[in-house]
């Protein structure tokens, strides 16, 4: 495991890093992920989630990476509705309804295109909301914990009927 602070939207950085490190496998966790921020400022989502993923795919292809895994989101499927008994499946059509989901769906399609065009070994996981250690403070669970610990009210989104599925990050990795 190597942690390097860099911007995947910076093609020169990505190209140099891949050429130097000679990876066998790439797991792309990098993403802008906040739905509300994607509505007020979508450009960074396009840059990071689409252009950045393209930079990683191209560097992986040119440097002989054996497998590329894209970490995506169930947001690409859109909404089920509160009274739905349906479930999202791997073959559920994508129907993104916010800039974040559209940027992740676009990245997923790029990943698929690298399999179809270059026969690159790629996989993709579209998980529900992840939680776990080191989660960014703007995310729901750490955000709510902070508010509660400070004695502040916890916001209710919309009419309070939204349903979310949560997956512990270690379970996602399995």
For the regions a protein language model found, what residue spans apply to each?
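Substrate-positioning beta->alpha
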Residues: 102, 110, 123-124, 135-146, ...
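Conserved catalytic core of Hanks-type protein kinase domains
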Residues: 29, 147-148
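N-terminal Rossmann-like NAD(P)+-binding domain of SDR-like oxidoreductases, especially those catalyzing
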Residues: 1-130, 170
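Short, hydrophobic secondary-structure boundary micro-motifs
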Residues: 47, 155-158
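Short, structured loop/turn "capping" segments at alpha-beta junctions
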Residues: 26, 154-155
